[in-house]
């Protein structure tokens, strides 16, 4: 693994730890101010014509409130993540990671919120630090 690939793997690990710790502050610290997060309507919606933008462009207060609400109202049952691929630009200032996830949240009434499938996390190096600029919602493969 190259130096940059290792840096990206550490970013994935840091994000995973933030989910595991239910740490909204650390989670949003990983996001670039221009980040967007499109979501497929279903895990089978591979055609981007079926995708949505439920969060809009990154807004620190709004996104932190949303993630904190999840953390406050759901218990994390499992959060399994496996990096499948890391690709780095020739300039070493952009990269993406393909990650298979199996994350299960359950609320106090037993309602499940499951994220299971594959995601793509896109990174840009900004002022010497990696930030997530785009992240796809979960797709089944």
For the regions a language model picked out, list residue spans one by one:
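A short hydrophobic beta-strand element
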Residues: 77-81, 92-103, 117
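A short, structured loop/turn motif at beta-sheet edges
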Residues: 86-95, 123-129
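Short beta-strand edge/turn micro-motifs at domain boundaries
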Residues: 114-141
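Short, low-complexity N-terminal intrinsically disordered segments enriched in polar/charged residues
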Residues: 1-34, 110
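A solvent-exposed, acidic/Ser-Thr-rich amphipathic alpha-helical stretch
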Residues: 5-6, 24-91
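Short, solvent-exposed loop/turn segments at secondary-structure junctions
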Residues: 45, 104-106, 141
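Short, cysteine-centered beta-strand-loop-beta hairpins and adjacent loop/turn segments enriched
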Residues: 73, 104-113
